[in-house]
Amino acid sequence: MSEPTLRVYLNALRRLYIIRDIKAWAPALRSKTPLRQAGVWHLCDPSLAAAVLETDANGLLSDLNTMGYLFESLCVRDLRVYLRPLNGEVCHYRDKNGLEADAVLRLQDGRWAAVEVKIGGEKNIEEGAANLRSLAEKVDQKRTGAPAFLMVLTGGQYAYTRPDGVHVVPLACLSH
């Protein structure tokens, strides 16, 4: 597919509110690691993708990779909804070394927080927390400020704060 054709399709999906652009967050960093400046796309309503794939909960449970992508889009959608009354925005972070945060929550006064989305599993939660701690250490906190919080957003049942200060929060616990 040619690039102009792809642009036409992406613009149509945006106008139909099927995808939403999430721009890259570019904080002041301590290191010289280049950042990826390209935005990412998330589905406005991940249930549409499940319908197009003609799958149900059992089908998604047998394809955890697809379920993970849909869960991440669901989480980003909900975070955007909860930030709207605060005039905040959801961005993403990824550098050329592969360090990423699925969502960076930014408020107009400069406060920020980083979020990794993991459906569950202690190993995945540990990986997400490690990524968040690495990101917080990499950011020049004198210029950007310390993160308001670091959170691994999960599909689990219990919210808790780890000894390293990273919050582990089920998506179901988020509310206004």
Name each model feature, range by range:
Residues 94, 152-154:
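Short beta-strand/turn micro-motifs composed of small residues
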Residues 86, 142-147:
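Short helix-terminating capping/connector loops at secondary-structure junctions
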Residues 120-141:
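Mg2+/Mn2+-dependent nuclease catalytic core
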Residues 51, 125-126, 159-163:
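Switch/connector loops and helix/strand junctions flanking conserved nucleotide-binding motifs
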Residues 1-111:
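Accessory nucleic acid-recognition modules appended to NTPase machines
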Residues 111-123:
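Active-site ExK catalytic segment of metal-dependent nucleases
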Residues 155-176:
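Domain-level recognition of nuclease-like catalytic cores that cleave nucleotide substrates
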Residues 114, 151-152:
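Structural beta-sheet core signal
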